[in-house]
Amino acid sequence: MIVSGLALGCDTVGHEGALLAEGKTIAVLPTPIDAPVYPSQNQGLADRIVGGGGALVSEYAPGAMLHDKQLVSNLVARDEWQPGLSDGVIAIETSVAGGTNHAMKHAQGTNTPIAVFDYSSRMGEDFYADERFGGNVKYLKDGAFPIFEASTIEDFKIAMESYRQRNFRGASGGTALGRDSQLNLFG
């Protein structure tokens, strides 16, 4: 399952990839659920997410009136909600100041596993010098799980499962709850 923010770029590609694979995806919105989708270019994608059995979620009550000045802080809040709905966070491409950093920092603060794409084997030293990947480089130095080929994505999935097993136990402290018992959004 893909949880992302419906932003243009990697978020859009992630949601569309999940739908193409007939998987589920959740879009965390920076606006109330009944407001126009932001960004408006992704209204059709939002409709396909819901039509495909996914979900649009928002922390803002339907009908809430939000001002344009609030959008920046809403975008940050949206980014911070995503790790809370996820077993792990993967950064595809982020600069040091990119919005992805809000999600990554929140994940680090809650000990949610993080991974970043490591393009150094393809780009060589250019990877470390390219500002578009400054955040990737930073998180790799901080110990994020490196993803550089398909098998490392599978390894990260194992790390996320281990995290879930350690952190989501029943009230009795017994065996770990299954995914469906933890969060059954899709019935």
What spans do the regions from the language model cover?
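Glycine-biased, small-residue-rich flexible motifs in mid-sequence functional cores and linkers
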Residues: 1-187
